[in-house]
Design a protein with these regions (language model features):
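Residues that define the transmembrane beta-barrel architecture of outer-membrane proteins
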Residues: 92, 133-142, 171-175, 213-217, ...
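N-terminal periplasmic/intermembrane-space "pro-region" immediately following the signal or transit peptide
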Residues: 22-108
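Outer membrane beta-barrel
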Residues: 83-238, 251, 255-260, 290-293, ...
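Transmembrane beta-strand segments that form the barrel wall of outer-membrane beta-barrel proteins
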Residues: 156-167, 230-239, 263-274, 354-358, ...
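Outer-membrane beta-barrel "beta-signal"
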Residues: 389-395, 401, 418-432
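Outer-membrane beta-barrel translocator domains and adjoining extracellular loop/strand segments
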Residues: 110-115, 166-176, 197-203, 238-249, ...
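Detector for outer-membrane/organellar transmembrane beta-barrel domains
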Residues: 227-228, 252, 257-381
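Gram-negative bacterial Sec-dependent N-terminal signal peptides
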Residues: 1-25
Length: 432
């Protein structure tokens, strides 16, 4: 029995051994395949890691190159800005501006003075040495200006110097020269009373009847009453050659912005007129407006009433007359107005239509005291039309026609009391 069991066990073991060998053989093959797959996976991971590292290095190189380019660009840009910024020896920022201006005029009728600009108050009366068929040209209105600014812990200090060549015999002439600190201005600039802001645009550098281009040495204070209203007070040297200046002219101007399109300016002036033997108070009021009808259409108007002064508003008669003893015996009063409309047709073209009128009071005492009634005017008027063309931004070309007349208080020997101004003006400007 035992022998049978041993034989049976032996036979079972003998039969199972080949099967175990076959199973072991299969397991080894699978392990080898797994090892090969793991090895391939490791190789693939290594290649992927190398690729990622290479990409990262390339990205760093690109970013580094980009940063270098950006730094170079910023450095170059900064260099240009620094090169363009001008400073004075004292450290003030400096801005240069101005224009080169060529004026020409063909005068069919007009004044006898050699200058080509407005002479309406002195044009010869008809038939009396009229200056007709004259061509005139000049570059004297060429302008050069410097703006200065110094920053301080309190507030900025600014200044301006501007000159042209409209002095005697084309001599250099100061237009503006002033210091501005806070609300205060000291120096020479536009009069606080006779401002040019409300005159219609002209080519003529001296403007037309009803306007004023007066610049005076002055001390000015600007007080802001609100966001839309400010009051400007000034003491001015009116440079009136007919008067012995003892006290400055006092002027006041109230500006009010009604809305984005309408601006109004009310002005007043009082000054003393003095001779060696007498004194008289002169005064005046003014009212100006600027109205933007549309974004491309603008109306300007300015009105003055003045008594006893001829130094602020252009083209007026002498403010006062004296006798042989230097006593003031009469004063002149006048009213003047100018109005015009400017239309911007497109970015290159714009044009203006304007009209100006001045009328003196019929003061018989003044008229009878005139030494020459043909040289004082009962009234003056001028009308003009112009067009400006700007082919490119720095260049401006203009053409203008103006006609006007003056009527004297007394007739010339031939009986004429009227003189005419009849001109065509042209201008070419390069602004910088």
């Amino acid at each position: 029995m035992l022998t049978f069991k041993l034989k049976t066990l032996f036979i079972a073991c003998a039969c199972s051994f080949p099967m175990m060998s076959f199973a072991a053989s299969n397991t080894d093959a699978e392990l080898q395949q797994l090892r090969d797959e793991v090895k391939a996976l490791k190789l693939l991971m290594q290649q992927y890691a190398q690729q990622q590292q290479s990409n990262a290095q390339n990205l760093q190189q690109v970013q580094a190159q980009s940063n270098i380019t950006k730094m170079n660009a910023e450095s170059t840009s900064g260099l240009k800005i620094e090169t363009m910024r001008l400073k004075t020896k004292a450290g003030a920022e400096l801005t240069l501006y101005g224009n080169v201006r060529a004026d020409a005029s063909y005068q069919a009728e007009g004044g006898s003075a050699t200058r080509l600009y407005n002479q309406i108050n002195t044009v010869p009366l008809a038939g009396n040495s009229e200056s007709s068929d004259r061509l005139k040209a000049t570059l004297a209105a060429t302008r050069l200006g410097l703006d200065f600014k110094t920053s301080t812990p309190d507030q900025d200090i600014s200044a301006k110097i501007e000159v042209d060549f409209l002095g005697t015999n084309d001599a250099l002439r100061i237009r503006h020269a002033y210091i501005n600190y806070g609300n205060w201005l000291v120096g020479q600039t536009w009069s606080n009373f006779a401002v040019p802001d409300y005159m219609p645009e002209t080519i003529d550098a001296l403007a037309y009847v009803g306007g004023a281009v007066k610049r005076t040495p002055q001390v000015r204070y600007n007080h802001k009453l609100s966001q839309i209203t400010n009051l400007v007070l000034a003491a001015e040297d009116s440079k009136d050659e007919s008067s012995n200046l003892r006290l400055p002219a006092l002027t006041a101007r109230l500006n009010h912005q009604f809305n984005e399109r309408l601006l109004l300016s009310a002005r007043a002036m009082a000054t003393e007129k003095k001779t060696d033997a007498d004194t008289e108070t002169a005064w005046g009021i003014g009212l100006g407006t600027k109205f933007d009808v549309t974004d491309k259409t603008m109306i300007k108007a300015d009105y003055y009433h003045v008594k006893g002064d001829s130094s602020f508003v252009s083209w007026s008669n002498s403010g006062f007359l004296t006798n042989a003893n230097k006593e003031i015996i009469a004063t002149n009063a006048f009213d003047s107005i100018t109005i015009g409309i400017t239309q911007q047709f497109n970015p290159q073209f714009k044009g203006t239509l304007g009209y100006g009128y001045m009328k003196a009071d019929q003061n018989d005492t003044y008229i009878n005291a005139l030494p020459d009634k043909t040289k004082a005017n009962k009234d003056l008027w001028q009308a003009w039309a112009n067009v400006f063309y700007s082919p490119i931004k720095p260049i401006s070309l203009g053409l203008e026609y103006v006609y006007g007349e003056r009527e004297a208080f007394g007739p010339a020997p031939n009986g004429s009391q009227t003189g005419s101004d009849n001109r065509v003006n042209a201008v070419a400007m390069y602004n910088f």
